[in-house]
């Protein structure tokens, strides 16, 4: 059963900037309420790790996570890296001038779509740490590929700006069903409002009924 639970974090429906997940662990900021732990455990069905990156709660922006590993930006602190490594995942710092790395990488467990903005040396780290084939491309000509889509092992939901050609390419890259959708009443930057794994999705609480139905169809 694929559950979808609407939540707010720090008073905003942009929950994806604060939370990152795979199928084993979900990373949340230290000072979110306990009810978010409950939502994670009941919906995503993972353990919970309360971490920061550069002492910031923006885990969804500053990390890229799949079942194989975790990528962190250069501004992460050494003691924070140690905490991530203690979970037994592959962990490395991606050497790039960009800090909001999740905007530039759309990562599954076998393939990652990477923005052409990301330096070639950084792309190799993506491949090694996440254990994926790296494909460099845009979505609708936009290099912020990680912000415009979310995926799990069943489906990929992408912003409505994506063309038919984009949908076809994404389906070929990731070998899952692909369709367009929005979150939080029409927002195209899906990563900002959706945290998804194979078990379920947490979404911003402004998400409308038709948006929830589309998520269930594509990701469930």
Curated annotation (Swiss-Prot):
| Keyword Protein biosynthesis in record | yes
Which cysteines are disulphide-bonded? none
* One GO cellular component, as annotated: cytosol
Keyword terms of this UniProt record:
Initiation factor, Protein biosynthesis
GO annotation (BP), single: maturation of LSU-rRNA
The record ties this protein, via Pfam families, to:
eIF-6
TM stretches of this protein: none
Q: Which domain of life is it from?
A: Archaea
**UniProt GO MF annotations:** ribosome binding; translation initiation factor activity
Cited InterPro entries? eIF6
Q: What does this protein do?
A: Binds to the 50S ribosomal subunit and prevents its association with the 30S ribosomal subunit to form the 70S initiation complex.
Q: Which NCBIfam families match?
A: eIF-6, PRK04046.1-1
Which HAMAP family did the record assign?
eIF_6 (MF_00032)
Sequence similarity: Belongs to the eIF-6 family.
The entry's protein name is: Translation initiation factor 6
Tell me the organism's taxonomic lineage.
Archaea, Thermoproteota, Thermoprotei, Thermoproteales, Thermoproteaceae
């Amino acid at each position: 059963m694929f559950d979808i639970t609407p939540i707010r974090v720090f008073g905003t429906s942009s929950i994806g900037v604060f939370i990152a997940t795979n199928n084993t662990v979900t990373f949340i900021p230290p000072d979110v309420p306990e009810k978010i732990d409950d939502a994670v455990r009941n919906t995503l069905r993972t353990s919970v790790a309360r971490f920061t990156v550069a002492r910031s709660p923006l885990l969804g922006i500053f990390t890229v996570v799949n079942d194989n590993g975790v990528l962190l930006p250069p501004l992460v602190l050494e003691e924070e890296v140690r905490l991530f490594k203690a979970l037994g995942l592959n962990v490395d710092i991606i050497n790039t001038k960009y800090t909001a790395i999740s905007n530039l990488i759309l990562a599954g467990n076998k393939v990652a779509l990477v923005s052409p903005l990301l330096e070639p040396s950084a792309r190799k780290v993506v491949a090694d740490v996440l254990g994926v084939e790296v494909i460099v491309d845009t979505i609708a000509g936009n290099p912020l590929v990680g912000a415009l889509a979310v995926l799990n092992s069943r489906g990929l939901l992408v912003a409505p700006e994506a063309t038919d050609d984009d949908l076809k390419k994404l389906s070929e890259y990731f070998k899952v069903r692909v369709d367009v959708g929005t979150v939080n009443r029409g927002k195209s930057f899906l990563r900002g409002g959706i945290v998804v794994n194979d078990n379920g999705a947490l979404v911003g609480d402004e998400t409308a009924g038709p948006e929830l139905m589309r998520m269930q169809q594509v990701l469930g």
